[in-house]
Design a protein with these regions (language model features):
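Propeptide-to-catalytic entry region of secreted or membrane-anchored zinc metalloproteases
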Residues: 19-129
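Sec-exported extracytoplasmic/periplasmic mature domains
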Residues: 74-82, 176-183, 238-244
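The catalytic-center signature of Zn2+-dependent metalloproteases
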Residues: 157-232
């Protein structure tokens, strides 16, 4: 009987913590793309940002694309530091559903936000996205996105290199993590494409809808943009200031 009381007491002690952890998981901004924008942009809750990249062997990210992403994050957030780690893994798949992407992230991802550091997780996959084989990149949670490296290479054209496309796509997907365009807020600027929600109507913006599509070569003349335009930047500034 005494042993039973000890067990019951342990359950009663553990339950509040378990319930609190469950509550945090249910209300976490990481459940919805764009919902973590304030945690990413501001330094109030997380002063540092770390980018964890997991890639299929032989489909590693271009170093210049990663450096550019770091630069864009430094330019648009209040973070005191931005760091990167990379790890490869094997895969024999050639097509990935969203469920499979989530499962791969769960298996490969090592870090989640904690202490003073917010974590952005990026997957680099071979093959294609099962739901849309034209997809070059996809932001699918509040802190994660995937790039389809093989599709990016296939999208390269005479005047547009795979490296330039990758730079655009990686910054574009980061833009979705910080809620561009009009994802959960209403911009004071008329720059959302009515035919492509949450994308810019300006082909000189990295948030232009065609950036994450394999049709990019047919939609953009010359080198694709890899930076935010003035309307995008003003939206991000207003978010940081708590005005959006």
């Amino acid at each position: 009987m005494k042993g039973l009381k000890v067990i019951l007491a342990a359950v009663l002690v553990l339950m509040p913590g378990c319930l609190e952890n469950l509550k945090e998981e249910l209300v976490s901004c990481e459940n919805v793309t764009g919902e973590c924008r304030y945690e990413i942009l501001r330094s109030t809750d997380y002063s540092r940002l770390h980018i964890e990249i997991n890639y299929v062997t032989e489909f590693a990210p271009d170093s210049e694309a990663v450096d550019l992403l770091k630069q864009r994050i430094q330019e648009t957030t209040d973070k005191t530091s931005v760091s990167v780690s990379q790890n490869g893994f094997g895969s024999t798949d050639s097509s990935y559903s969203l469920e499979e992407i989530l499962a791969i992230e769960k298996e490969q991802r090592e870090r989640h936000k904690s202490g003073n550091t917010f974590i952005i997780h990026i997957l680099y996959l071979n093959g294609e996205y099962e739901d849309n084989d034209q997809t070059l990149g996809l932001a699918y949670t509040g802190s994660s996105f995937v790039l389809f490296k093989e599709q990016i290479s296939d999208a390269a054209f005479f005047l547009i290199s795979a490296e330039d496309i990758e730079k655009s796509v990686i910054v574009h997907e980061y833009g979705h993590l910080v809620a561009l365009v009009n994802n959960g807020y209403e911009s004071p600027h008329d720059h959302e494409d009515p035919d492509h929600p949450n994308h810019s109507n300006n082909e000189d913006s990295v948030m232009y809808w065609a950036i994450e599509s394999q049709d990019i070569a047919n939609q953009i003349d010359g080198e694709p943009p890899n930076n935010f335009d003035s309307n995008d930047l003003d939206d991000l500034k207003l978010m940081k200031e708590g005005k959006l």
